């Protein structure tokens, strides 16, 4: 339930239309409003509405209930499967099955990319892949912010390294589960592997490339190609914290297994 008298919100004294506007106009579409009763979607009473984050949760959530699964399928097959579930097909003869809304699976996106930073690359290599850290999921996007108008979230615009992931291979070989949030962010809980929890293993990295031309390709087809260039300026981005490296503005290369900051 959306409660305008909840402590952190009450002090701001917002109106329901202001909250609707904030949710609707958010450039990253981080939140979603849902009517408690779908038949009452025109209500102006906040008590008739639910609000939630589309992704970025640090508390445990039910991915299957909130997110659309990614499956190795075709767009047509995915839509047909969703239609069958929604129509309650599958019951016995004469048996009426109450339709239950089921998230329609989506085919594997052509591009799934995670954005990170020079400061975090050594620790990614050392741990054997991308980690979800304190979140429930590793976040990816289906394109680069600014290059694709459909990409509204999933990666910071100042990301320095692009980690392209072979999602289909990760599903086939590791049974990894992938999801799409309401605002188009691609999410995965990863797998437990090599003593690490919630990992997207580096063997599923299709390519890791710097956004700067002088960085080049670091990883390809699950294999190391090169380290970060020596003397590269490494800056921990604002709001990302982490220890390691040489602090803000330090210089170093990115040798394999080196000590770095936390991955995001």
Predicted regions and their residues:
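Conserved NAD+-utilizing ADP-ribose enzyme module
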Residues: 2-138, 142-264
């Amino acid at each position: 339930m959306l409660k305008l008298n909840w402590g952190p919100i009450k002090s701001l004294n917002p109106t329901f239309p202001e909250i609707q506007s904030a949710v609707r106009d958010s450039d990253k579409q981080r939140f979603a409003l849902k009517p408690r009763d779908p038949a009452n979607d025109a209500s102006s009473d906040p008590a008739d509405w639910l609000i939630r984050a589309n992704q970025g949760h640090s508390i445990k959530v039910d991915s299957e209930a909130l997110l659309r699964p990614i499956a190795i399928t075709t767009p047509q097959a995915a839509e047909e499967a969703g239609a069958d579930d929604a129509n309650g097909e599958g019951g016995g003869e004469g048996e009426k099955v109450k339709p239950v809304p089921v998230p329609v699976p989506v085919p594997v996106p052509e591009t799934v990319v995670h954005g990170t930073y020079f400061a975090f690359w050594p620790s990614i290599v050392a741990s054997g892949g991308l980690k979800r850290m304190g979140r429930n999921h590793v976040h990816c996007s289906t394109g680069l912010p600014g290059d694709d108008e459909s990409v509204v979230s999933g990666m910071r615009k100042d990301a320095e390294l692009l980690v392209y992931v072979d999602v289909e291979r990760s599903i086939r070989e590791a049974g990894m589960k992938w999801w799409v949030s309401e605002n188009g962010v691609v999410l995965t809980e990863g797998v437990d592997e090599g003593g690490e929890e919630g990992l997207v293993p580096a063997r599923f990295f299709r390519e890791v490339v710097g956004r700067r031309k002088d960085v080049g390709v670091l990883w390809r087809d699950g294999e190391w190609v090169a380290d970060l260039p020596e003397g590269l300026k490494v800056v921990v981005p604002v709001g990302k914290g982490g220890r390691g490296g040489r602090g803000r503005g330090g210089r170093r290369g990115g040798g394999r297994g080196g000590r770095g900051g936390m991955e995001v």
